[in-house]
């Protein structure tokens, strides 16, 4: 689904429960899954709590796996995800990635274009938790 613009603001969402849950996670939660940091140079200065991730080796087959962050965040993340999807997207899509990501103090994300074909077939929805 092409939205014909590089960025579209969807407006405010009630992220209070998700924010509180993410901010309450211990240091270990942010270190359970290092795949993104090890596989993608641009993510070295980040930590993630990954809930869902598509198997990029099997693309274009869409095989989505629940990751260690699922039991930590799903109860509060799913209602918010479903609300956004129901308000802004037609039925029939699949969430192929869901995570909380943290830029480490002093870290930088350099401008980049993600190369995997799955990024050309989906939209990213970012919900700022804290800045």
Give the label of every model feature segment.
Residues 94-96, 123:
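A generic structural signal for short beta-strands and their flanking turns/coil linkers
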Residues 1-91:
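Non-heme Fe(II)/2-oxoglutarate
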Residues 99-118:
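Conserved short histidine dyad/triad with adjacent acidic residue
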Residues 21, 46, 94, 110, ...:
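Residue-identity detector for threonine
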Residues 32, 36, 112-117, 123-125:
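General "foldedness" signal
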Residues 102-104, 119-131:
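Short, conserved beta-strand element in jelly-roll/cupin
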């Amino acid at each position: 689904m092409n939205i014909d613009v590089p960025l579209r603001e969807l407006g405010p969402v009630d992220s209070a429960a998700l924010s509180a849950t993410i901010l309450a996670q211990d240091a270990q939660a942010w270190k359970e899954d290092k795949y993104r940091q090890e596989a993608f140079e641009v993510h070295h200065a980040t930590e993630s709590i990954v809930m869902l991730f598509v198997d990029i080796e099997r693309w274009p087959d869409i095989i989505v796996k629940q990751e260690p962050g699922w039991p930590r965040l799903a109860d509060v993340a799913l209602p918010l995800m479903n609300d956004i999807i129901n308000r802004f997207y037609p039925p029939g899509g699949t969430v192929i990635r869901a995570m909380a990501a943290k830029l480490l103090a002093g870290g930088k994300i350099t401008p980049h274009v993600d190369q995997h074909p799955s990024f050309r077939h989906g939209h990213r929805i970012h919900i700022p938790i804290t800045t």
